[in-house]
Amino acid sequence: MKITTRYIVGIVILVVGLFTILLIRPSRFVWTPTFAHEDKNPFGCFVFDSVMVQTMPRGYKATGATLRETVADSSSNNVLIVARDGKLTDANITDIKRLLKRGSTVMLVGVDIYEDSNADKAFGLQCITYANFFYNEIKNKLAHNSDDLYDTLHYRAVYKDAHGTKRHRLPRCIAYPDADYRIYKTLLAGVVNIDSAAAVHRRYYILSQCVSPYYDDEYKPDNDYKAVMVEYGRGRLVVVTTPLLFTNFGILSPSTQPYVMRLMNTLADKPVVRLDASMKDGAVIGADADKHNASPLSYILSQPPLRWAYYTIIAGALVFIIFTARRRQRVIPVIP
């Protein structure tokens, strides 16, 4: 066998061996939240959606429809929106109101509502969420048996009125016994506040709050609410600050799965539709949601880098056509 042939055979064996190792070795998890239907990583929703399809009694599906498209659908559905730092526009608020007046329940998970915003004025709620997971930090604390790793989430559905918090007639969907859940602190960041003036006119139900000592008393909120439900029209709006629990990780973890199922039960009286931005490579709420209804060309022209790339391709094609035409239009010499 020639030396060249040996080298070729050796390279082929090496390449095949490397590919085999890459295929059979376990893949590393990606801990970045996507909430995507097809994502099987911890903070995707492949398993979450699969479990909900089997457990929601009236039906469940994930869809790439925007909130506006969902409102236009005449079907009577409850809506679940799980986002990362989601923002509501005035159009989104109008659409949510229409769903609530229709009798639907809308659950907003990971959607920020700032003080004095139009959403705050509409529903009497402020909400700050947080969706980052520091894997290495948690891994180090677990290795050292750190006490500063967990927090206690307390489920105790109570009615909030203008005079304070008290027991009240609870809707069946939230009337569970009190329960405590010991959960990683980083999964429980965020807080919901109730406008005391709005509580005079509406019924608010506090579903859960953290009860452990706060990591920094200087910044500790008065009420560390994590999930709040408000009655609006014929429907209910549920605001949740913990989007990382509505994922594969949250539904598979024994410490969080019962809590997630309690919250999901608020949607169980009708078919549930989860709006998933990843299914259309865009957004289902916020200013970017209009991109779903735009043509591919309009989206390209709306993005400066894509727009200049498009113009460059067009200009290059024109130059190529011109020079090609000039080269082919040669003068044919006349042979005497």
Regions found by a protein language model. Give the residues of each.
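A glycine-centered loop/beta-turn motif at secondary-structure junctions
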Residues: 182-292
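Membrane-embedded segments
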Residues: 60-156
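Flexible, active-site-adjacent loop/turn segments at secondary-structure boundaries
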Residues: 33-35, 123, 243-244, 249
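Mixed-charge, polar/low-complexity N-terminal
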Residues: 4, 10-22, 28, 80-81, ...
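Alpha-helix initiation/capping motif
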Residues: 66, 114, 242, 275-276, ...
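An acidic, glycine-rich "communication" segment
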Residues: 112-214
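Long alpha-helical segments found as membrane-embedded helices
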Residues: 1-60, 70-78, 83-102, 106, ...
